[in-house]
Amino acid sequence: ALWKGGEVDLQLCADETHRRLGKEGYTIRTSEGKTVLEAATEQGLLYATYHLLRLQAEGADCTRLDIQEKPAFDIRVLNHWDNLDGTIERGYAGRSLWKWEDLTDSVSARYREYARANASVGINGTVLNNVNASPEILSSDYLQKVRKLADVFRPYGIKVYLSVNFASPMKLGGLSTADPLDEEVARWWKEKVQEIYGLIPDFGGFLVKANSEGQPGPCDYGRTHAEGANMLAEALKPYGGIVMWRAFVYSPSDADRAKQAYLEFQPLDGRFRDNVMVQVKNGPIDFQPREP
């Protein structure tokens, strides 16, 4: 959309008000016929701009504005269930947006439109691939392709995250185990994380589905979900990355699926590192955040 109103002034501000609003907060005010957008960062100004355009589209009176905004949630992320072969698990609207086979040589203009659309509603992160992850997403060839997407998304304040297979050290690194307490395994992850941040300095982190529906995980080695998540969190911590560890865990050995997440995670309360988030589904199974 194009702005059809009067003069607009965008300003970066380091005053107390904008420090309090954080790096994504902003103010919009009108003064003497001019609209002033102020924020502590360029990302805040981006969101302020979209807010102003949204008001215009709604037909609001934009001549007397006095707005302060601060996001209620720091991480506002999309989880794509896209596979590397272009299929989408539970996908009902065609194939994947990501043309991995083309990203070696070209970058589709659709990726910029994707970033613009998501930034306009405040999305600031995207997990590119299915939680039932192929280890290949962490190969050097694929990371180069991920870098190209990250470069397109960055101006719109969108960080890239990856779903990872917990057995990647075995599949890609040739190790004999993926035990999170094994020193070689931890070293492999630290080196892989270092490689990722060398390509994508603002990489968001990992999403992990472990020990659920046949996916590998720390429980295969007698370790807890916390021990598995914390090993990855330690590798990501120096770079500001996070781990999103899914709580959707169940196996066919117990008929009562609804209690399994509680039984596995409640004893681990307080044992996860501060850059680990336990991610639940907004559904009737994981701790019943929403009843059917």
Go through each PLM region and give its residues:
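Structural motif
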Residues: 12-17, 38-42, 82, 247-249, ...
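Short acidic low-complexity segments
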Residues: 2-13
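Residues at or immediately flanking beta-strands
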Residues: 7-9, 159, 207, 242
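Catalytic-core regions of glycoside hydrolase
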Residues: 148, 174-292
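Charged, often glycine-rich, active-site loop that binds/positions anionic groups
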Residues: 15-22, 258-262
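Feature activates predominantly on carbohydrate-active enzymes
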Residues: 17-207, 237
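Domain-scale selection of a single, long terminal region
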Residues: 1, 22, 26, 37, ...
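Structural alpha-beta junctions
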Residues: 1-4, 57-60, 153-157, 230-243, ...
